[in-house]
Design a protein with these regions (language model features):
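Generic signature of intrinsically disordered, low-complexity, basic-rich segments
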Residues: 4-7, 21, 48, 79
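Electrostatic cytochrome c docking/interface patches
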Residues: 2-19, 54
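Periplasmic/extracellular electron-transfer cofactor-ligation site
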Residues: 11-40, 63-65, 87-90
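Extracytoplasmic electron-transfer domains, predominantly the class I c-type cytochrome c fold
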Residues: 37, 41-90
Length: 90
């Protein structure tokens, strides 16, 4: 679960952006506007109103076409991505 660094506040936004570019942008779009039907628009997404823990669990398990990232990314890397996603909100 979440450790001492288990919040987006303790996360590294720059690393999150790098990870997002490598693993997420092809479907979710480089600026958060989705490229794949069914992907949330992170610039205007109610998905980002969820807690960090809820988003972490969602990314770990995946959904529909999105793969599960448990085992592919460490929890801290996912938290870095969550922190980066929160910068996309307008």
């Amino acid at each position: 679960m979440l450790g001492a660094a288990g919040s987006a506040a303790a996360a590294d936004i720059n690393k999150g952006g790098q990870i997002y570019s490598m693993h997420c942008a092809n479907c979710h779009g480089g600026s958060g506007i989705p490229m794949m039907p069914g992907s949330p628009n992170f610039q205007r997404s109610e998905k980002l109103f969820q807690t960090d823990a809820m988003l972490l669990a969602s990314i770990r398990r995946g959904k529909n076409a999105m793969p599960a990232y448990a085992g592919l990314l460490r929890d801290q890397e996912i938290m870095d991505v969550i922190a980066y996603l929160r910068t996309m909100q307008r």
